[in-house]
Design a protein with these regions (language model features):
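C-terminal motif of bacterial Sec signal peptides marking the signal peptidase cleavage site
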Residues: 18-21
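A ligand-binding cleft/hinge motif common to bilobed small-molecule-binding domains
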Residues: 91, 108-116, 161-164, 189-193, ...
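Acidic, polar ligand-binding/catalytic clefts
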Residues: 72, 81-144
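Periplasmic-binding protein-like
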Residues: 49, 126-133, 211-248, 267-278
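Short helix-initiation/N-cap motifs at beta->coil->alpha
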Residues: 83-94, 177-190, 229
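Ligand-binding cleft/hinge of the Venus flytrap
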Residues: 57, 71-79, 158-180, 210-215
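Extended ligand-binding regions for polar small-molecule ligands
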Residues: 23, 68-77, 143, 147-149, ...
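Extracytoplasmic small-molecule ligand-binding "clamshell" domains
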Residues: 28-107, 256
Length: 278
């Protein structure tokens, strides 16, 4: 066999391996994978590691938060370990449908646009979009944002409704757009330093962050005027058994009082939706 034939043979072999790997991954993203999660005793959840108090990284590198505790409790019922995978939140659905993660679970709001890409569990917590401003700015209502600079997280549900319902906020802010940030942390730093005038953000994040920083008295929390949202877990559309079992675990955890225990730990109240309670 000459060198040319050897090289062609090696190339064909490598190509077959690549196609096989791609085919395997493609199959996994189009299948109901519950038996695989059970046999491997592992599921990978994608999250934004800066989203306090839902799921975030501590100074020692470990992850904590309401969603972290809740997800771990859910999968403990099935003997499955959660692998937490930090992701670029703007690419979350891509990461899910490419098979890099199995679930999106991190203050993930249900929207019509997202329903086209993922299969949602029952909602487990309600949320609201608000605008945070400095009290020193004299911006205390939505109309005060006229010609002001607004910030928002790229890929967030807040930015999505900002775009889809322009009459509420987009049409009045400077340049009819919002400065987009990779994380809320970056946006809050710019708000503190007067590089933006207001920040469109999840109420749950803003309340926790400002209280933890001890600066909540220095900021206004303004209802942005959008409809309230609901947090749920996002799965691939083929993973129906996974979604059914998460819903089942939600209900069981609530009946056992574990859901309320986790809720009290992070919010000081029971945040469960009726879908969880019933």
């Amino acid at each position: 066999m000459n060198i040319k034939k050897m090289m062609l043979g090696a190339l064909a072999f490598l190509t077959s391996l690549t196609l096989a790997a791609c085919g395997s991954n493609d199959s996994a993203t189009k299948s109901d994978n519950w038996t695989a999660y059970e046999s491997e005793k592992s599921v990978t959840i994608g999250f934004d590691k800066t989203f306090v108090p839902m799921g975030f990284e501590q100074t020692d590198g470990s992850y904590t938060g309401f969603d972290i505790d809740l997800a771990n409790a859910v999968f403990e019922k099935y003997g499955i370990t959660v692998k937490w995978q930090p992701i670029d939140w703007d690419l979350k659905e891509t990461e899910l449908n490419n098979g890099n993660i199995d679930l999106i679970w991190n203050g993930y709001s249900i929207t019509d646009e997202r329903k086209e890409k993922v299969l949602f569990t029952n909602p487990y917590m309600d949320n609201q979009q608000i605008i945070v401003t400095k009290k020193s700015s004299n911006i205390s209502q939505v109309s005060d944002m006229k010609d002001k600079i607004l910030g928002a997280q790229a890929g967030s549900s807040g930015y999505s409704v900002f775009e889809s319902q322009p009459a509420i906020l987009k049409d009045i802010v400077q340049n009819n757009d919002a400065s987009q940030y990779a994380t809320f942390n970056e946006a809050l730093i710019d708000l503190k330093n007067d590089r933006i005038d207001g920040l469109l953000i999840d109420r749950v994040y803003a309340n926790y962050y400002l209280q933890q920083e001890g600066i909540i008295a220095d900021y206004n929390i303004i209802d942005a005027g959008f409809e309230n949202e609901a947090f749920a877990v996002g799965a691939r559309k083929s993973d129906t058994t996974l979604v059914e079992n998460i819903n089942k675990a939600f209900a069981e955890l609530y009946k056992e009082g574990k859901f309320q225990e986790i809720s009290q730990k992070w919010f000081g109240e029971d945040v469960a939706t009726d879908a969880v309670k019933n």
